[in-house]
Protein backbone atom coordinates (compact mmCIF):
# COMPACT_ATOMS: atom_id res chain seq x y z
CA UNK A 1 0.00 0.00 0.00
CA UNK A 2 2.81 2.41 0.88
CA UNK A 3 4.55 1.62 -2.40
CA UNK A 4 1.41 2.52 -4.39
CA UNK A 5 1.08 5.82 -2.54
CA UNK A 6 4.72 6.67 -3.19
CA UNK A 7 4.44 5.84 -6.91
CA UNK A 8 1.24 7.89 -7.19
CA UNK A 9 2.84 10.89 -5.48
CA UNK A 10 5.97 10.85 -7.69
CA UNK A 11 3.96 10.47 -10.90
CA UNK A 12 1.63 13.32 -9.89
CA UNK A 13 4.59 15.58 -9.17
CA UNK A 14 6.23 14.85 -12.56
CA UNK A 15 2.94 15.39 -14.40
CA UNK A 16 2.31 18.74 -12.73
CA UNK A 17 5.89 19.90 -13.45
CA UNK A 18 5.51 19.02 -17.14
CA UNK A 19 2.25 20.93 -17.36
CA UNK A 20 3.80 23.94 -15.64
CA UNK A 21 6.71 24.08 -18.16
CA UNK A 22 4.28 23.83 -21.07
CA UNK A 23 2.17 26.62 -19.60
CA UNK A 24 5.25 28.83 -19.27
CA UNK A 25 6.14 28.31 -22.93
CA UNK A 26 2.67 29.18 -24.21
CA UNK A 27 2.41 32.11 -21.85
CA UNK A 28 5.67 33.62 -23.21
CA UNK A 29 4.53 33.23 -26.81
CA UNK A 30 1.16 34.80 -26.05
CA UNK A 31 2.77 37.80 -24.34
CA UNK A 32 5.17 38.33 -27.26
CA UNK A 33 2.29 38.21 -29.70
CA UNK A 34 0.34 40.84 -27.83
CA UNK A 35 3.37 43.14 -27.75
CA UNK A 36 4.03 42.70 -31.45
CA UNK A 37 0.47 43.55 -32.39
CA UNK A 38 0.85 46.93 -30.69
CA UNK A 39 3.99 48.07 -32.60
CA UNK A 40 3.57 50.42 -35.55
CA UNK A 41 6.08 51.72 -38.12
CA UNK A 42 6.97 55.40 -38.54
CA UNK A 43 4.16 56.00 -41.00
CA UNK A 44 1.66 54.62 -38.47
CA UNK A 45 -0.32 52.61 -41.04
CA UNK A 46 1.15 49.08 -41.29
CA UNK A 47 1.70 46.55 -38.51
CA UNK A 48 4.97 44.69 -38.21
CA UNK A 49 4.31 41.27 -39.66
CA UNK A 50 6.21 39.29 -37.03
CA UNK A 51 3.56 36.95 -35.71
CA UNK A 52 4.78 33.95 -37.70
CA UNK A 53 8.36 34.42 -36.48
CA UNK A 54 7.38 33.48 -32.91
CA UNK A 55 7.05 29.78 -33.90
CA UNK A 56 10.56 29.24 -35.32
CA UNK A 57 12.48 29.00 -32.03
CA UNK A 58 14.48 31.08 -29.61
CA UNK A 59 16.72 32.69 -32.26
CA UNK A 60 13.77 34.07 -34.18
CA UNK A 61 12.16 35.30 -30.96
CA UNK A 62 15.37 37.09 -29.99
CA UNK A 63 15.52 38.72 -33.43
CA UNK A 64 11.92 39.80 -33.10
CA UNK A 65 12.52 41.38 -29.69
CA UNK A 66 15.62 43.16 -30.98
CA UNK A 67 13.72 44.55 -33.92
CA UNK A 68 10.88 45.67 -31.69
CA UNK A 69 13.30 47.43 -29.36
CA UNK A 70 14.86 49.27 -32.31
CA UNK A 71 11.47 50.33 -33.61
CA UNK A 72 10.35 51.58 -30.18
CA UNK A 73 13.59 53.57 -29.78
CA UNK A 74 13.12 55.44 -33.04
CA UNK A 75 11.64 58.94 -33.15
CA UNK A 76 8.29 59.14 -34.94
CA UNK A 77 9.10 62.62 -36.26
CA UNK A 78 10.84 61.99 -39.58
CA UNK A 79 11.65 65.64 -40.16
CA UNK A 80 13.95 65.77 -37.17
CA UNK A 81 16.06 62.81 -38.38
CA UNK A 82 16.27 63.49 -42.09
CA UNK A 83 18.94 66.12 -41.72
CA UNK A 84 21.05 63.93 -39.49
CA UNK A 85 20.68 60.85 -41.75
CA UNK A 86 21.64 62.83 -44.83
CA UNK A 87 24.58 64.34 -43.04
CA UNK A 88 25.99 60.90 -42.05
CA UNK A 89 26.85 59.92 -45.63
CA UNK A 90 28.87 63.05 -46.43
CA UNK A 91 32.62 63.49 -46.30
CA UNK A 92 34.53 65.18 -43.53
CA UNK A 93 35.14 68.28 -45.63
CA UNK A 94 31.50 68.72 -46.48
CA UNK A 95 30.61 68.08 -42.86
CA UNK A 96 32.99 70.84 -41.76
CA UNK A 97 31.48 73.21 -44.28
CA UNK A 98 27.99 72.41 -43.11
CA UNK A 99 28.99 73.04 -39.52
CA UNK A 100 30.27 76.50 -40.41
CA UNK A 101 27.01 77.26 -42.17
CA UNK A 102 25.05 76.03 -39.21
CA UNK A 103 27.08 78.19 -36.83
CA UNK A 104 26.40 81.19 -39.02
CA UNK A 105 22.70 80.48 -38.99
CA UNK A 106 22.66 79.83 -35.25
CA UNK A 107 24.33 83.17 -34.37
CA UNK A 108 22.27 84.89 -31.66
CA UNK A 109 20.20 87.86 -32.65
CA UNK A 110 20.23 91.02 -30.54
CA UNK A 111 17.33 93.41 -30.67
CA UNK A 112 18.33 97.05 -30.61
CA UNK A 113 16.35 99.59 -28.61
CA UNK A 114 14.61 102.20 -30.66
CA UNK A 115 16.44 105.54 -30.15
CA UNK A 116 14.53 108.65 -31.27
CA UNK A 117 16.55 111.26 -33.13
CA UNK A 118 17.20 114.78 -31.86
CA UNK A 119 14.79 116.33 -34.30
CA UNK A 120 12.14 113.65 -33.95
CA UNK A 121 10.14 114.20 -30.73
CA UNK A 122 8.32 111.32 -29.11
CA UNK A 123 4.90 111.03 -30.80
CA UNK A 124 3.46 109.79 -27.48
CA UNK A 125 4.84 112.62 -25.34
CA UNK A 126 2.49 114.83 -23.27
CA UNK A 127 1.74 117.94 -25.36
CA UNK A 128 0.81 119.93 -22.22
CA UNK A 129 4.10 119.53 -20.35
CA UNK A 130 5.19 122.72 -18.58
CA UNK A 131 8.38 123.94 -20.33
CA UNK A 132 9.38 125.65 -17.06
CA UNK A 133 8.75 122.62 -14.86
CA UNK A 134 11.16 121.80 -12.07
CA UNK A 135 13.68 119.30 -13.43
CA UNK A 136 14.19 117.97 -9.88
CA UNK A 137 10.57 117.04 -9.24
CA UNK A 138 10.09 113.86 -7.25
CA UNK A 139 9.06 111.18 -9.75
CA UNK A 140 7.06 109.52 -6.96
CA UNK A 141 5.17 112.67 -5.99
CA UNK A 142 1.44 112.47 -5.30
CA UNK A 143 -0.37 113.09 -8.62
CA UNK A 144 -3.52 114.11 -6.73
CA UNK A 145 -2.01 117.06 -4.85
CA UNK A 146 -4.53 119.74 -3.88
CA UNK A 147 -4.09 122.64 -6.40
CA UNK A 148 -5.45 125.03 -3.73
CA UNK A 149 -2.98 123.96 -1.07
CA UNK A 150 -1.45 126.60 1.22
CA UNK A 151 1.67 127.95 -0.51
CA UNK A 152 3.00 129.09 2.88
CA UNK A 153 2.64 125.73 4.58
CA UNK A 154 4.94 124.93 7.48
CA UNK A 155 8.03 123.22 6.05
CA UNK A 156 8.64 121.61 9.45
CA UNK A 157 5.14 120.17 9.80
CA UNK A 158 4.72 116.86 11.59
CA UNK A 159 5.11 114.09 9.01
CA UNK A 160 3.05 111.80 11.28
CA UNK A 161 0.13 114.19 11.59
CA UNK A 162 -3.35 112.68 11.68
CA UNK A 163 -4.64 112.59 8.08
CA UNK A 164 -8.19 112.47 9.44
CA UNK A 165 -7.82 115.53 11.69
CA UNK A 166 -10.84 117.74 12.26
CA UNK A 167 -10.79 120.51 9.60
CA UNK A 168 -13.02 122.63 11.86
CA UNK A 169 -10.76 122.42 14.90
CA UNK A 170 -10.61 125.38 17.27
CA UNK A 171 -7.70 127.62 16.13
CA UNK A 172 -7.48 129.03 19.67
CA UNK A 173 -7.29 125.64 21.37
CA UNK A 174 -4.99 125.20 24.36
CA UNK A 175 -1.60 124.07 23.01
CA UNK A 176 -0.80 122.55 26.42
CA UNK A 177 -3.98 120.50 26.67
CA UNK A 178 -3.77 117.02 28.18
CA UNK A 179 -3.09 114.59 25.31
CA UNK A 180 -4.68 111.81 27.39
CA UNK A 181 -7.85 113.74 28.18
CA UNK A 182 -11.14 111.83 28.25
CA UNK A 183 -12.65 112.05 24.75
CA UNK A 184 -16.07 111.42 26.29
CA UNK A 185 -15.82 114.17 28.89
CA UNK A 186 -18.97 116.07 29.79
CA UNK A 187 -19.07 119.22 27.59
CA UNK A 188 -21.35 120.85 30.18
CA UNK A 189 -19.05 120.17 33.12
CA UNK A 190 -18.74 122.76 35.88
CA UNK A 191 -15.84 125.09 34.95
CA UNK A 192 -15.51 126.04 38.63
CA UNK A 193 -15.28 122.47 39.89
CA UNK A 194 -12.99 121.72 42.80
CA UNK A 195 -9.57 120.79 41.35
CA UNK A 196 -8.80 118.81 44.52
CA UNK A 197 -11.99 116.78 44.45
CA UNK A 198 -11.84 113.09 45.36
CA UNK A 199 -11.10 111.16 42.13
CA UNK A 200 -12.57 108.02 43.71
CA UNK A 201 -15.82 109.64 44.77
CA UNK A 202 -18.98 107.58 44.48
CA UNK A 203 -20.49 108.30 41.04
CA UNK A 204 -23.89 107.30 42.41
CA UNK A 205 -23.75 109.56 45.45
CA UNK A 206 -26.93 111.23 46.61
CA UNK A 207 -27.09 114.67 44.91
CA UNK A 208 -29.46 115.83 47.66
CA UNK A 209 -27.19 114.79 50.51
CA UNK A 210 -27.09 116.94 53.63
CA UNK A 211 -24.28 119.50 53.17
CA UNK A 212 -24.01 119.79 56.95
CA UNK A 213 -23.66 116.07 57.56
CA UNK A 214 -21.36 114.85 60.31
CA UNK A 215 -17.88 114.41 58.78
CA UNK A 216 -16.98 111.98 61.56
CA UNK A 217 -19.96 109.72 61.05
CA UNK A 218 -19.48 105.98 61.50
CA UNK A 219 -18.31 104.57 58.11
CA UNK A 220 -19.63 101.15 59.11
CA UNK A 221 -23.08 102.33 60.04
CA UNK A 222 -25.98 99.99 59.35
CA UNK A 223 -27.25 100.78 55.81
CA UNK A 224 -30.57 99.17 56.71
CA UNK A 225 -31.13 101.20 59.86
CA UNK A 226 -34.68 102.08 60.78
CA UNK A 227 -35.47 105.46 59.16
CA UNK A 228 -38.22 105.96 61.75
CA UNK A 229 -36.00 105.35 64.76
CA UNK A 230 -36.84 107.14 67.99
CA UNK A 231 -35.01 110.50 67.95
CA UNK A 232 -35.29 110.61 71.75
CA UNK A 233 -33.70 107.21 72.30
CA UNK A 234 -31.45 106.73 75.29
CA UNK A 235 -27.92 107.73 74.22
CA UNK A 236 -26.51 105.62 77.04
CA UNK A 237 -28.30 102.44 76.07
CA UNK A 238 -26.64 99.12 76.85
CA UNK A 239 -24.26 98.31 73.93
CA UNK A 240 -24.31 94.63 74.94
CA UNK A 241 -28.06 94.25 74.86
CA UNK A 242 -29.46 90.89 73.78
CA UNK A 243 -29.67 90.93 69.94
CA UNK A 244 -32.30 88.19 70.11
CA UNK A 245 -34.56 90.00 72.54
CA UNK A 246 -38.29 89.53 72.14
CA UNK A 247 -39.51 92.23 69.72
CA UNK A 248 -43.03 91.73 71.05
CA UNK A 249 -42.16 92.25 74.68
CA UNK A 250 -44.80 93.78 76.92
CA UNK A 251 -44.33 97.56 76.77
CA UNK A 252 -46.16 97.82 80.09
CA UNK A 253 -43.98 95.35 81.93
CA UNK A 254 -43.51 95.78 85.65
CA UNK A 255 -40.59 98.17 86.12
CA UNK A 256 -40.12 96.80 89.64
CA UNK A 257 -39.79 93.18 88.57
CA UNK A 258 -37.31 90.98 90.41
CA UNK A 259 -33.92 91.41 88.67
CA UNK A 260 -32.78 88.06 90.09
CA UNK A 261 -35.69 86.04 88.76
CA UNK A 262 -35.08 82.42 87.78
CA UNK A 263 -33.63 82.44 84.22
CA UNK A 264 -34.57 78.76 83.83
CA UNK A 265 -38.21 79.15 84.60
CA UNK A 266 -40.58 76.75 82.91
CA UNK A 267 -41.43 78.26 79.49
CA UNK A 268 -44.58 76.14 79.38
CA UNK A 269 -45.94 77.30 82.70
CA UNK A 270 -49.67 77.71 82.99
CA UNK A 271 -50.48 81.29 81.93
CA UNK A 272 -53.82 80.97 83.70
CA UNK A 273 -52.40 80.03 87.06
CA UNK A 274 -54.40 80.96 90.13
CA UNK A 275 -53.43 84.52 91.03
CA UNK A 276 -54.70 83.87 94.55
CA UNK A 277 -52.53 80.83 95.19
CA UNK A 278 -51.50 80.07 98.73
CA UNK A 279 -48.38 82.12 99.45
CA UNK A 280 -47.48 79.70 102.23
CA UNK A 281 -47.49 76.56 100.07
CA UNK A 282 -44.95 73.84 100.79
CA UNK A 283 -41.73 74.77 98.92
CA UNK A 284 -40.51 71.15 99.15
CA UNK A 285 -43.42 69.52 97.38
CA UNK A 286 -42.75 66.23 95.60
CA UNK A 287 -41.43 67.11 92.11
CA UNK A 288 -42.19 63.55 90.90
CA UNK A 289 -45.85 63.51 91.69
CA UNK A 290 -47.98 61.38 89.40
CA UNK A 291 -49.18 63.67 86.62
CA UNK A 292 -51.82 61.09 85.62
CA UNK A 293 -53.51 60.77 88.98
CA UNK A 294 -57.16 59.77 88.76
CA UNK A 295 -59.22 62.94 89.30
CA UNK A 296 -62.30 60.81 89.92
CA UNK A 297 -60.85 58.61 92.62
CA UNK A 298 -63.28 57.28 95.19
CA UNK A 299 -62.81 59.43 98.27
CA UNK A 300 -64.07 56.57 100.42
CA UNK A 301 -61.18 54.28 99.41
CA UNK A 302 -58.78 56.28 101.50
CA UNK A 303 -60.32 54.96 104.70
CA UNK A 304 -59.92 51.25 103.91
CA UNK A 305 -56.56 50.96 105.65
CA UNK A 306 -52.98 52.12 105.42
CA UNK A 307 -51.40 48.82 104.33
CA UNK A 308 -49.22 48.53 101.19
CA UNK A 309 -48.48 45.67 98.82
CA UNK A 310 -49.52 42.30 100.19
CA UNK A 311 -50.35 43.88 103.54
CA UNK A 312 -53.29 45.73 102.10
CA UNK A 313 -56.77 44.69 103.26
CA UNK A 314 -58.58 42.13 101.17
CA UNK A 315 -59.39 43.53 97.76
CA UNK A 316 -61.41 41.40 95.32
CA UNK A 317 -59.54 42.80 92.29
CA UNK A 318 -56.03 42.61 93.73
CA UNK A 319 -55.17 39.03 92.73
CA UNK A 320 -56.51 39.47 89.20
CA UNK A 321 -54.43 42.60 88.60
CA UNK A 322 -51.24 41.05 89.96
CA UNK A 323 -51.55 37.98 87.70
CA UNK A 324 -52.22 40.14 84.65
CA UNK A 325 -49.17 42.29 85.36
CA UNK A 326 -46.96 39.22 85.75
CA UNK A 327 -48.07 37.78 82.42
CA UNK A 328 -47.51 41.08 80.66
CA UNK A 329 -44.00 41.36 82.09
CA UNK A 330 -43.06 37.92 80.74
CA UNK A 331 -44.63 38.71 77.38
CA UNK A 332 -42.87 42.05 76.96
CA UNK A 333 -39.42 40.71 77.75
CA UNK A 334 -39.07 39.60 74.12
CA UNK A 335 -40.20 42.95 72.64
CA UNK A 336 -38.31 45.47 74.76
CA UNK A 337 -35.35 47.31 73.27
CA UNK A 338 -31.86 46.11 74.22
CA UNK A 339 -30.31 47.86 77.18
CA UNK A 340 -26.97 49.67 77.21
CA UNK A 341 -25.46 46.79 79.13
CA UNK A 342 -26.62 44.32 76.49
CA UNK A 343 -25.12 46.53 73.73
CA UNK A 344 -21.79 46.84 75.55
CA UNK A 345 -21.53 43.08 76.11
CA UNK A 346 -22.33 42.37 72.46
CA UNK A 347 -19.69 44.86 71.24
CA UNK A 348 -17.02 43.24 73.41
CA UNK A 349 -18.04 39.84 72.12
CA UNK A 350 -17.67 40.70 68.42
CA UNK A 351 -14.93 43.34 68.70
CA UNK A 352 -12.46 41.35 66.59
CA UNK A 353 -14.98 40.77 63.81
CA UNK A 354 -16.27 44.35 63.53
CA UNK A 355 -16.28 45.82 60.01
CA UNK A 356 -18.16 48.34 57.88
CA UNK A 357 -20.81 45.68 57.20
CA UNK A 358 -23.73 45.11 59.56
CA UNK A 359 -23.11 42.36 62.10
CA UNK A 360 -25.65 39.54 62.72
CA UNK A 361 -28.45 40.28 65.11
CA UNK A 362 -27.39 39.90 68.73
CA UNK A 363 -30.40 37.71 69.56
CA UNK A 364 -32.23 34.85 67.91
CA UNK A 365 -35.60 35.78 69.38
CA UNK A 366 -37.17 39.17 70.06
CA UNK A 367 -35.42 42.54 69.72
CA UNK A 368 -31.65 42.72 69.39
CA UNK A 369 -29.01 45.00 67.96
CA UNK A 370 -26.79 45.13 64.90
CA UNK A 371 -23.59 47.18 64.78
CA UNK A 372 -20.99 48.22 62.24
CA UNK A 373 -18.02 50.59 61.96
CA UNK A 374 -18.81 53.94 60.34
CA UNK A 375 -17.15 54.40 56.92
CA UNK A 376 -15.17 57.39 58.16
CA UNK A 377 -13.61 55.31 60.97
CA UNK A 378 -12.82 52.19 58.96
CA UNK A 379 -9.03 52.77 59.15
CA UNK A 380 -8.90 53.15 62.92
CA UNK A 381 -7.46 50.30 65.02
CA UNK A 382 -10.24 48.29 66.60
CA UNK A 383 -8.93 48.80 70.11
CA UNK A 384 -9.15 52.61 69.62
CA UNK A 385 -12.75 52.71 68.38
CA UNK A 386 -15.15 54.93 70.28
CA UNK A 387 -18.47 53.16 70.78
CA UNK A 388 -20.33 56.48 70.69
CA UNK A 389 -18.71 58.16 67.66
CA UNK A 390 -17.18 55.34 65.58
CA UNK A 391 -19.86 52.63 65.90
CA UNK A 392 -23.24 52.72 64.19
CA UNK A 393 -26.11 50.78 65.82
CA UNK A 394 -29.61 49.74 64.82
CA UNK A 395 -32.39 47.60 66.32
CA UNK A 396 -33.13 44.20 64.77
CA UNK A 397 -36.24 42.11 65.43
CA UNK A 398 -36.37 38.32 65.19
CA UNK A 399 -39.88 36.97 64.57
CA UNK A 400 -39.24 33.21 64.96
CA UNK A 401 -38.88 32.74 68.69
CA UNK A 402 -39.80 29.04 69.07
CA UNK A 403 -36.73 26.96 69.81
CA UNK A 404 -38.60 23.81 68.78
CA UNK A 405 -39.32 25.32 65.38
CA UNK A 406 -35.66 26.30 64.96
CA UNK A 407 -34.47 22.77 65.79
CA UNK A 408 -36.97 21.15 63.41
CA UNK A 409 -36.14 23.60 60.66
CA UNK A 410 -32.40 22.97 61.03
CA UNK A 411 -32.96 19.20 61.10
CA UNK A 412 -34.99 19.24 57.91
CA UNK A 413 -32.31 21.28 56.16
CA UNK A 414 -29.57 18.89 57.30
CA UNK A 415 -31.55 15.84 56.16
CA UNK A 416 -32.12 17.39 52.72
CA UNK A 417 -28.40 18.11 52.27
CA UNK A 418 -27.35 14.60 53.33
CA UNK A 419 -29.94 12.91 51.13
CA UNK A 420 -28.82 14.97 48.15
CA UNK A 421 -25.19 13.97 48.70
CA UNK A 422 -25.77 10.24 49.20
CA UNK A 423 -28.49 9.67 46.63
CA UNK A 424 -26.50 11.28 43.87
Swiss-Prot record:
<keyword id="KW-0461">Malaria</keyword>
<feature type="repeat" description="4">
    <location>
        <begin position="135"/>
        <end position="138"/>
    </location>
</feature>
<keyword id="KW-1003">Cell membrane</keyword>
<feature type="repeat" description="16">
    <location>
        <begin position="183"/>
        <end position="186"/>
    </location>
</feature>
<keyword id="KW-0963">Cytoplasm</keyword>
<feature type="repeat" description="15">
    <location>
        <begin position="179"/>
        <end position="182"/>
    </location>
</feature>
<feature type="compositionally biased region" description="Polar residues">
    <location>
        <begin position="301"/>
        <end position="316"/>
    </location>
</feature>
<feature type="repeat" description="2">
    <location>
        <begin position="127"/>
        <end position="130"/>
    </location>
</feature>
<feature type="compositionally biased region" description="Low complexity">
    <location>
        <begin position="120"/>
        <end position="300"/>
    </location>
</feature>
<feature type="repeat" description="20">
    <location>
        <begin position="199"/>
        <end position="202"/>
    </location>
</feature>
<feature type="repeat" description="43">
    <location>
        <begin position="291"/>
        <end position="294"/>
    </location>
</feature>
<feature type="repeat" description="33">
    <location>
        <begin position="251"/>
        <end position="254"/>
    </location>
</feature>
<feature type="repeat" description="38">
    <location>
        <begin position="271"/>
        <end position="274"/>
    </location>
</feature>
<feature type="propeptide" description="Removed in mature form">
    <location>
        <begin position="402"/>
        <end position="424"/>
    </location>
</feature>
<feature type="repeat" description="29">
    <location>
        <begin position="235"/>
        <end position="238"/>
    </location>
</feature>
<keyword id="KW-0325">Glycoprotein</keyword>
<keyword id="KW-0677">Repeat</keyword>
<feature type="repeat" description="21">
    <location>
        <begin position="203"/>
        <end position="206"/>
    </location>
</feature>
<feature type="repeat" description="3">
    <location>
        <begin position="131"/>
        <end position="134"/>
    </location>
</feature>
<feature type="glycosylation site" description="O-linked (Fuc) threonine">
    <location>
        <position position="364"/>
    </location>
</feature>
<feature type="repeat" description="7">
    <location>
        <begin position="147"/>
        <end position="150"/>
    </location>
</feature>
<keyword id="KW-0336">GPI-anchor</keyword>
<feature type="repeat" description="28">
    <location>
        <begin position="231"/>
        <end position="234"/>
    </location>
</feature>
<feature type="repeat" description="37">
    <location>
        <begin position="267"/>
        <end position="270"/>
    </location>
</feature>
<dbReference type="GO" id="GO:0098552">
    <property type="term" value="C:side of membrane"/>
</dbReference>
<feature type="repeat" description="6">
    <location>
        <begin position="143"/>
        <end position="146"/>
    </location>
</feature>
<feature type="compositionally biased region" description="Low complexity">
    <location>
        <begin position="322"/>
        <end position="336"/>
    </location>
</feature>
<feature type="region of interest" description="Disordered">
    <location>
        <begin position="69"/>
        <end position="339"/>
    </location>
</feature>
<feature type="repeat" description="39">
    <location>
        <begin position="275"/>
        <end position="278"/>
    </location>
</feature>
<feature type="repeat" description="19">
    <location>
        <begin position="195"/>
        <end position="198"/>
    </location>
</feature>
<protein>
    <recommendedName>
        <fullName>Circumsporozoite protein</fullName>
    </recommendedName>
</protein>
<feature type="repeat" description="17">
    <location>
        <begin position="187"/>
        <end position="190"/>
    </location>
</feature>
<feature type="repeat" description="1">
    <location>
        <begin position="123"/>
        <end position="126"/>
    </location>
</feature>
<feature type="region of interest" description="Required for the binding to heparan sulfate proteoglycans (HSPGs) on the surface of host hepatocytes">
    <location>
        <begin position="104"/>
        <end position="111"/>
    </location>
</feature>
<feature type="region of interest" description="44 X 4 AA tandem repeats of P-N-[AV]-[ND]">
    <location>
        <begin position="123"/>
        <end position="298"/>
    </location>
</feature>
<feature type="signal peptide">
    <location>
        <begin position="1"/>
        <end position="18"/>
    </location>
</feature>
<feature type="repeat" description="9">
    <location>
        <begin position="155"/>
        <end position="158"/>
    </location>
</feature>
<feature type="repeat" description="27">
    <location>
        <begin position="227"/>
        <end position="230"/>
    </location>
</feature>
<feature type="repeat" description="11">
    <location>
        <begin position="163"/>
        <end position="166"/>
    </location>
</feature>
<feature type="repeat" description="40">
    <location>
        <begin position="279"/>
        <end position="282"/>
    </location>
</feature>
<keyword id="KW-0449">Lipoprotein</keyword>
<feature type="repeat" description="42">
    <location>
        <begin position="287"/>
        <end position="290"/>
    </location>
</feature>
Amino acid sequence: MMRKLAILSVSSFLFVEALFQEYQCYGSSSNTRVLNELNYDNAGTNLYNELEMNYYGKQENWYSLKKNSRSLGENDDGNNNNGDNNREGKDEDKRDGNNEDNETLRKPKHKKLKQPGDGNPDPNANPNVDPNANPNVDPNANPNVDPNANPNANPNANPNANPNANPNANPNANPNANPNANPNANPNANPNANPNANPNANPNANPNANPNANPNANPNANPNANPNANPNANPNANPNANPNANPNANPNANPNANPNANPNANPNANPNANPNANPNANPNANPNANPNANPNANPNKNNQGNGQGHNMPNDPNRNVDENANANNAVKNNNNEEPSDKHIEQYLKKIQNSLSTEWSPCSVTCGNGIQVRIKPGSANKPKDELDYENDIEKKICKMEKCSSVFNVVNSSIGLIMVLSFLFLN
